[in-house]
Amino acid sequence: DMDLYWADGTTTQTETTPVMLTNAGRSKKKAIVSFVDDDCRSEAYTVLFPLVQELGMPYTVACPAGLMGKTGRMTVEQLQEMARSGVTVACHTMTETDMEQDTPETLEATLQQFEAEMRRWGIRGVRSYAYVNGRYKADCLNTVKKYFDLGLTVEKGINQIPYESCRMKRVEVFPKNKSYTLEDVKAWVDKAVQDGGWLILMTHAWYTTFDAAQLKELVGYIRASGAELMDLYDALDATGNVVEAGDYQKPGADAAEPFFVV
C-alpha cells in the first residue's frame, strides 16, 4: 500500500486518493518501478513467465502480433494465458518494423492491423507502444498518441511528471553487450528512490545475458528499497495526473513552448 504524505505529516489512503509522484511539493515523492520484456520470444513464456508467477510481480510483454506462433516466438495461446494471469501487453508493431521506415500513413495501417489482432485474440487494454530498436520519428508521434497512452524508448533515465508520454525512458537489465551490470541497474533504483519518479526497466528474456537468479535478486532489491513495483498501466493511472497538450520534448532551444493541462 502507498500513502501520501501531506504538509502536516499526516497520511491518507482511500480508494479515491491518487498516488502522485509530486503534488506541488506537498506530497512525498514516490519511486515506482515497472518491467517490460520486448519481442515475445519463446523464452518470455518458458523462462520469464514462471519467474513472474513465482515472484508475484507485475510485468508487461511487448508483442509483435504478426510474428506470434512463428519459429522462436510465443504462440497466441501462450500470450492469452499470460494475459489471463495478469501480465499486460504492449505493442511492438506487427513484424518488428522500425519506425524510421514508416510514414504516418504506413504506421497508422500497422497499428490498425495490430489492434484488430488484439481484438481477435481477446486481449484488451494495450495502451503502450515499445518502439522497435527504440527508434521513433517526430512526424509519427501524433499517430502514436492516437492509439496509445505511452511510447517506450530505449533511452536511459527516470520518468518525471510531466511525462514525455511518447518518449518514455527505459533502462535495460542484462544488456546484450554487457555494457553495464546488475549493480548499475540497482544504482538506477537507488536514484529513483532518492529523487522520486518512474523507472521502467526493460528485459529481453531471450538474450543469453538474461539471468533468472539476478532478476530475482533485483526484484528483492526493489522491494526492500521502498520503491513500489507496479504494472506499467497501473503506474500510469496512479500518477498520470497531467495531460499533455502538443508535442513535448525537453531539449531543443527552438522547440515550441510546451504547455500542460492539469
Residue ranges of model-derived segments:
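C-terminal domain-boundary segment and adjacent tail
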Residues: 5-27, 54, 59-63, 67-69, ...
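Metal-dependent polysaccharide deacetylase catalytic core of the NodB/CE4 family, i.e.
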Residues: 31-33, 53-150, 154-173, 196-205, ...
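Short active-site segment of divalent metal-dependent hydrolases/proteases
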Residues: 41-42, 95
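Aromatic/hydrophobic pocket-lining residues that form the small-molecule binding cavity
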Residues: 45, 75, 107, 111, ...
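Histidine-anchored nucleotide/phosphate-binding helix
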Residues: 45-52
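Alpha-helical elements of Rossmann-like donor-binding domains used by nucleotide-donor carbohydrate transfer enzymes
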Residues: 47, 113, 139, 143, ...
